[in-house]
Amino acid sequence: HRSETITSPSKLEDFIAVLRFLSSKKNKRVVLSLHPNTMDNLRKRGLKMPKNIIISPPFKFTDYVFLMKNADLVFSDSGTLAEESSLLNLKAINLREEQERHEAMDESATILVGFNKDRILDAVDFYEKRNGNQENLNSTVQDYEVSNFSEKMVKTVISYTDYVNRIVWQR
């Protein structure tokens, strides 16, 4: 759903080619959750999907988490994939050229591959060689193991409300 993904014909076509390959050669059913803009771009380009690729509008977050937890492998360009992969112990391939979650990269929570077909397939092969072993796939990223996170966030919001109103919104 990222703009650099859906506005780049080559990235979109490379990704669809990988999905076609995986769905046919690996005999896997693929659930592809697409934002409306991405769906429009697929239609405009006339890109067709095999029958075992199920296209769906975006899921509610709880349904999306359920789907990820029960997937053999998760591909996403989402900014939150690092957290989800770390906390849910997912086999995750991050379809971005870069990411803001450096702490997750330092602890290898995902495999960052961009849209290069060969790199994506290398990541798939890496996970397949684990023979389905999910145990200890990811250790939780240390920065995500904060026991009183909610309390800290409330204190931060309270602390910065006046500052943001004054400096950002000039109220």
PLM region spans:
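Nucleotide-activated sugar donor-binding and catalytic core shared by glycosyltransferases
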Residues: 2-171
